[in-house]
Design a protein with these regions (language model features):
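Core catalytic DNA strand-manipulation module of type IA topoisomerases
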Residues: 1-174
């Protein structure tokens, strides 16, 4: 998960090379923040799994399809780790109507950060984004504002239990 401080220079070069080598990173401006992954005190037996400089030179051409998927995942996770944080503004509005209290929540993305890389990586590999929810954006509101005949709808949803552990997820949870 972390690298040591003596690896910062080579990792910065590696990240620059990966941005050029990965097709889904074309046109993406990445300001790598290596301080997020560089911590000598958290490296115990081995530093984080990183692609090699040799891979940046050769690319995906010599890899089998399953190896390409794995390498793409490793590269994407490294780029997500050094990318800007995902920032959003969350708004909760509380309304009272006819003696009942209603709540509306909205979220506006300020900086997509690492989520942009994850989204592009998933799209390139053909995966669906499991966490993708439509962003609920609230209109501009002011305290004490009144509404005439607002449109309303009731939505009913069911919760889902957590997914069952597989052998891999059980080991990683332990």
């Amino acid at each position: 998960k972390y690298i040591t401080s003596d690896m910062e220079g080579s990792t910065k070069e590696l990240i620059t090379g990966l941005c050029a080598a990965l097709p889904f990173m074309q046109g993406v401006k990445l300001q790598a923040d290596l301080a997020r992954i560089c911590d000598n005190s958290k490296v115990t037996d081995h530093h984080a799994i990183l692609p090699t400089a040799e891979f940046v030179k050769t690319g995906f051409s010599s890899l089998a399809e399953s190896e390409k998927k794995l390498m793409t995942l490793v590269c994407a996770k490294l780029l997500c780790a050094v990318a800007a944080p995902y920032e959003y503004e969350a708004v909760t509005a509380v309304f009272t109507c006819g003696g009942y209290t209603f709540t509306a929540k909205g979220r506006t993305t300020l900086c997509e950060g690492w989520r942009e890389i994850e989204r592009l990586s998933r799209a390139a590999s053909g995966e669906q984004d499991e966490d993708a929810e439509p962003e609920a954006v609230l209109p501009p509101l002011a305290e004490g504002q009144t509404f005439d005949n607002p449109a309303a709808e009731i939505s009913e949803r069911y919760t889902q239990p957590p997914k069952a552990f597989t052998e891999d997820t059980l080991l990683s949870a332990m």
